[in-house]
């Protein structure tokens, strides 16, 4: 089925009692269902709360400017406005913080300031920020072998890999991140996490993993030496999360709550989706409000705000990889589960499929958050246009 933009009539997904249009379990993250589903994960999948605690809410002051008519280019390079680009790129929420103040905030597609939106792979950066806190306390040494903390992985492709290799996604573990192939490794992650059922008509002899750790233990092969090259593989984040749980004796959701979310001054409790073993899906299962994603970005911009170690953030901004490792980031790199847009500005980004973005820029003192529900997993033209728009906003 085709998707729909915010300017187009919306189909009655989950409307009525009982609703006539219900997202299918196999395709809830595909169009048009994802336009509803990314804001209603708790109605689709089992989740665990990331409690905000009883502390204060960090109030975001407002210094609003109407950026709707700001001239920008659309995904085809043609003139449009910011409002037009947000419509073209299936935006659910868009937030601009400048000097920690709300400059621009827009909600679409039924989203509100209290709605939790699926992060997709922005969860990796949230998880890694708490990982950095544990490193700062001396609980984890990034130079140590992964098997120091997870000895079971000695029989897997991670044998001989350092923790830093996993943080930077430069381990040599063979893993296919082919989103459209249900039998790929990432397709098996969907089944292991409980995001999807076993595909109908699948080979009865094929053994599908029942939870994430079982899948990790089954990844026996390497495709290259550890440290030889960057290759984006979501499963690396799940390995990091198991290390965090092992050294702390706490589950991931509790760690993120105690070490980050309660100290952030969040508006709302967040949540993770969980697998059948109760494991919070670190690689993409986090959900939070638009403003709370902004607060997280601002915390990173404030060099950790005394929560995440400043030296961890500085090290994160210094990633180095070869050219053209990402079609939408020709000068980019990757470090500690964050994307670096360009080595000159060293702006950090949290990115997720279907158009999720937190852009953190020290030069402009800006944080930009875009939550979306693209019709496709990735769209280079949309991503490039969005980044150009972020820079246009900085000059406005």
Regions found by a protein language model. Give the residues of each.
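Non-transmembrane alpha-helical segments in soluble domains
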Residues: 83-86, 132, 147, 164-167, ...
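Active-site-proximal alpha-helical segments within enzyme catalytic domains
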Residues: 169, 235-243, 282-305, 356-372
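A short acidic/small-residue loop/turn micro-motif
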Residues: 108-112, 116, 374-377
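Active-site helix/loop module of the DD-peptidase/beta-lactamase fold
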Residues: 118, 136-179, 218-221, 235, ...
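Short, charged, amphipathic alpha-helices and their helix-cap/turn boundaries
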Residues: 82, 101-106, 145-148, 183-226, ...
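Active-site Gly/Thr loop motif
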Residues: 267-270, 314-367
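N-terminal leader/targeting segments and the immediately adjacent pre-domain N-terminus
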Residues: 1-112, 139-140, 167-168, 172-174, ...
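Active-site SXXK
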Residues: 100, 118-142, 166, 240-244, ...
């Amino acid at each position: 089925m085709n998707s729909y933009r915010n300017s187009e009539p919306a189909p009655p997904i989950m409307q009525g009692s009982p609703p006539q249009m219900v997202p299918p379990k196999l395709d809830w993250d595909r169009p048009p269902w994802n336009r509803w589903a990314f804001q209603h994960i708790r109605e689709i999948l089992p989740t665990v709360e990331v409690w905000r605690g009883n502390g204060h809410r960090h109030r975001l002051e407002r210094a609003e400017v109407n950026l709707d008519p700001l001239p920008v280019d659309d995904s085809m390079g043609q003139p449009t406005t910011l409002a037009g680009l947000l419509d073209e790129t299936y935006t659910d929420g868009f937030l601009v913080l400048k000097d920690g103040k709300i400059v621009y905030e827009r909600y679409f597609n039924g989203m509100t300031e209290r709605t939790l939106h699926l992060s997709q792979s922005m969860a990796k950066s949230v998880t890694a920020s708490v990982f950095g806190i544990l490193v700062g306390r001396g609980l984890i040494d990034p130079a140590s072998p992964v098997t120091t903390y997870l000895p079971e992985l000695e029989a897997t492709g991670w044998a001989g890999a350092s923790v830093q290799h996993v943080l930077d996604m430069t381990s040599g573990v063979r893993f296919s991140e082919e989103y459209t192939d249900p039998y790929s490794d990432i397709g098996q992650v969907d089944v292991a996490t409980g995001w999807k059922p076993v595909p109908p008509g699948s080979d009865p002899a094929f053994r599908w993993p029942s939870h994430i750790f079982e899948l990790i233990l089954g990844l026996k092969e390497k495709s290259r030496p550890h440290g030889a090259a960057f290759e984006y593989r979501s499963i690396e984040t799940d390995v990091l999360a198991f290390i965090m749980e092992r050294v702390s004796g706490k589950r991931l959701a509790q760690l993120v709550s105690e070490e980050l979310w309660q100290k952030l001054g969040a508006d709302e409790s967040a949540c993770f989706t969980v697998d059948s073993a109760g494991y919070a899906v670190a690689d993409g299962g986090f959900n939070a409000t638009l403003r709370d994603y902004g607060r997280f970005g601002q915390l990173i911009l404030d060099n950790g705000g005394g929560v995440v170690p400043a030296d961890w953030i500085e090290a994160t901004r210094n990633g180095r990889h070869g050219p053209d490792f990402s079609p939408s980031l020709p000068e980019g790199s990757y470090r500690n589960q964050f994307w670096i847009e360009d080595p000159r500005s060293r702006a950090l980004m949290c990115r997720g499929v279907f158009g999720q973005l937190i852009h953190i820029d020290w030069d402009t003192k800006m944080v930009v958050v875009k939550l979306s529900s693209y019709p496709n997993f990735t769209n280079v033209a949309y991503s490039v246009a969005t980044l150009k728009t972020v820079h246009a906003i900085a000059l406005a």
